[in-house]
Amino acid sequence: MIRRLAEGRTVRSVGVEEELLIVESGTGRPRALASAVIRAAGPGAEEPGSGELCADERSAGELDAVQPLEFELQKQQLEIDTRPCYSLDELSRELRRCRATAAVAAARAGVTVAALGTSPVAVHPEVVPTSRYQAMAEAFGLTAQEQLTCGCHVHVGISSAEEGVAVLDRIQPWLATLLALSANSPFWQGVDSAYASFRYQAWGRWPCSGPTYQFGSVEVYQATVQQMIDTETLLDSGMVYFDARLSQHYPTVEVRIADVCQHAEDAVLIAALIRGLVETEARNWQAGRSDPPARTEQLRLARWRASRSGLDDVLINPVTFRPDKAVAVTGLLVEHVRDALADAGDTLLVADLLDAVLHRGNGAAAQRSEYQRRGRLVDVITAAAATTTS
């Protein structure tokens, strides 16, 4: 998962998992047609019960043989997974290919897909009938039954679990900025939630989600996970929904904080910044450098603020933990990972992609703008579906 280039540099793999809503073209109403869409994708697609594990729970040998489309918790959504990539151009092509595959399969089933963090219109989610998902619905009640949310998960290659835990410990203050950039879920059950990312608020209902304090070692990380399992509150270790965690089967760090982005290039930006963070903090660990750990309470407040405001108001500065302008906070993140971006050849593209988001706005801004312009939530969904595959 770390490739050595001819000139002696190394570059980390990066892969993206995205969850997409399945919606009716005319009304924007989410449709419980995951099975039909996934069947329409053709050979290699999962069937309910045969693919109960989430993407990062497949065996390492299946890393490059990803399924075209996969089930998620609810019948009104599906998941797409890119292959591991080593350049942002490659990742962009792969992500667009995956989105196009989902759109074509959805069209065959008489629906479409939309990269939206939550459904703008009212919906009654239907849990996919696998034993694991049904057990989750029974154990967690409305938390599971209402959990129709779509996120973007980024996997970045690491050299060892020790390096991975060191990275997890060091990236925590920076993750709220990624949430603000990706925020794409202002509407919930037909009303404006007043949040840029209400998905993050809904996701926070799980007992094991959110930020983590520094672990300090692989042993402590593993012991913490086991202690959580031992409470018999979670079904299994796959329900350890930290905002960033070690993948169970891949040699990667998985950052799970972002909303799914309407624009594919925004997802590429998020992935590039996460890869830059992983590389930067791995270097800091190797050099014996570390900042004083942020309190989990501070991290939670910073992420709440990012969820509430997105890019439209102040964020929490990850260095001072004081309010600061969103453009200043995003600039701090880019400066923090500057050397890693340069070494990966990502500097110019990241600058262009970030400039586009700051000028255009994130997905939440796009949804509210469309609703203000047209006055109908169905138009919000139609516009998002068009952007998803543009």
Q: Positions of the model-derived regions?
A:
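C-terminal accessory/tail domains of diverse enzymes
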Residues: 1-105, 109, 125, 203-390
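Metal-dependent DNA replication initiation modules
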Residues: 116, 120-122, 131, 136-152, ...
